[in-house]
């Protein structure tokens, strides 16, 4: 399984092409639209989300509600493009129009300046448009297809926010996976403690008035993954490493942890390692899950626990100082539309990116041309792991 995305933030559309999806997977536009709507939700989103109502068009690889095994083409139209016809025109236009929305004051924290240097852009909009988080629309669309595969194999997942702009979410003890999932899904903030909703919303409103932004830490949990996915035989086969790369590829993500993560640096080995158990009904298990479901780059059969830290959005309504790329004089950075926070949306993106990596790993491990073949191979492997 592999995919490519294409498109700009204010271009005509965003596109993804996915190759390697087995034939026979039930897939409807509504499956993808559901995830796209989740990405557009959450408290603290800006005006762009009120302009766009993302809906996917499937133009290949699916017939009568089933995948055919051919490449799948997904497209989302940018409604906002109508206001940017001159600025984002494919053909050449008058010089005066080119200057209309030219970006020459790069924003600290964005790809503007370095992208302009790398690709020799005189107008930094060419870097801004492609590096925008709008591209994650298609990462979510691809992830929605991946989640359909995982669901057919009995794998489920959730995400929730652990730290919201410096406020630590108090997680009620002994919540089951399903309870965590339900609480996060029904929260505008993707948190599992409803008692903290108003405090955080008030803080977001305050940050918005200040023209500032906040980041935080997101946790994704995956349930139902058997032991043995990934490999220790080569560095690039380790599944946790693949997940780390994928999570860090999400806009504004700057760090990844598994299990208790960086807290391991403060603990002894006897406190960190997960003791092994065995029962006739469940097979091998662990007393704890400090390592987040990974040992030696492979899954252990425990829930996968992946955490990602998202920096505050770098586009500020009270912009920081920058430099004019023509005169090299100090100027305030360009201001584009922005949100005080996009943590709930980033959680949806992270969840779908993790789903894509897992689906790809499963398809590589259990090579199958049809879903029925994949389901049988996966079921047989589960049975083998249980009786080992």
From Swiss-Prot:
Enzyme class: lyase
Pathway linked to the protein: Metabolic intermediate biosynthesis; chorismate biosynthesis; chorismate from D-erythrose 4-phosphate and phosphoenolpyruvate: step 7/7
One of the protein's GO biological processes: chorismate biosynthetic process
PROSITE patterns for the chain: CHORISMATE_SYNTHASE_1, CHORISMATE_SYNTHASE_2, CHORISMATE_SYNTHASE_3
Known EC number: 4.2.3.5
SUPFAM superfamilies attached to this UniProt entry: Chorismate synthase, AroC
Domain of life: Bacteria
Catalytic activity from the UniProt record: 5-O-(1-carboxyvinyl)-3-phosphoshikimate = chorismate + phosphate
Family assignment from sequence similarity: Belongs to the chorismate synthase family.
Function (record text): This reaction introduces a second double bond into the aromatic ring system.
UniProt-recorded name of the protein: Chorismate synthase
Organism of this sequence: Streptococcus pyogenes serotype M5 (strain Manfredo)
């Amino acid at each position: 399984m592999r995919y490519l995305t294409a498109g700009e933030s204010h271009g005509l559309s965003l596109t993804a092409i996915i190759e390697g999806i087995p034939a026979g997977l039930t897939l409807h536009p509504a499956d993808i639209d559901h995830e796209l709507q989740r990405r557009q939700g959450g408290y603290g989103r800006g005006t762009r989300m009120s302009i766009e109502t993302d809906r996917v068009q499937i133009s290949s690889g699916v017939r009568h509600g089933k995948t055919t095994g051919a490449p799948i083409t997904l497209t989302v139209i940018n409604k906002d493009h109508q206001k940017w016809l001159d600025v984002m025109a494919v053909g050449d236009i008058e010089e005066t129009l080119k200057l209309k929305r030219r970006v020459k004051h790069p924003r600290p924290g964005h790809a503007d300046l370095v992208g302009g240097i790398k690709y020799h852009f005189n107008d930094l909009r060419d870097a801004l448009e492609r590096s925008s988080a709008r591209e994650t629309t298609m990462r979510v669309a691809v992830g929605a297809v991946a989640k359909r595969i995982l669901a057919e194999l009995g794998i489920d997942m959730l995400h929730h926010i652990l730290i919201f702009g410096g406020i630590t979410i108090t997680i009620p003890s002994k919540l089951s996976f399903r309870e965590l999932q339900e609480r996060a899904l029904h929260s505008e903030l993707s948190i599992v403690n409803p008692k903290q909703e108003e405090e955080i919303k008030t803080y977001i409103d305050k940050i918005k008035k200040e023209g500032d932004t906040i980041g935080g830490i997101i946790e994704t949990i995956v349930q139902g993954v058997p032991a043995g996915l990934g490999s220790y035989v080569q560095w690039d086969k380790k599944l946790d490493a693949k997940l780390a790369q994928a999570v860090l590829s999400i806009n504004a993500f700057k760090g990844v942890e598994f299990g208790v993560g960086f807290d391991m640096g403060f603990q002894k080995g006897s406190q960190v390692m997960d003791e092994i158990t065995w029962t006739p009904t469940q097979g091998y298990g662990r007393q704890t899950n400090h390592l987040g479901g990974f040992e030696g780059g492979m899954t252990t059969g425990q829930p996968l626990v992946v955490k990602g830290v998202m920096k505050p959005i770098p586009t500020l309504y009270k912009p920081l100082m920058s430099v004019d790329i023509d005169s090299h004089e100090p100027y305030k950075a360009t201001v584009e539309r922005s949100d005080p926070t996009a943590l709930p949306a980033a959680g949806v993106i992270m969840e779908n990116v993790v789903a894509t990596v897992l689906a790809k790993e499963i398809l590589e491990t259990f090579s199958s041309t049809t879903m029925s073949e994949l389901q049988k191979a996966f079921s047989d492997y589960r049975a083998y792991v249980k009786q080992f």
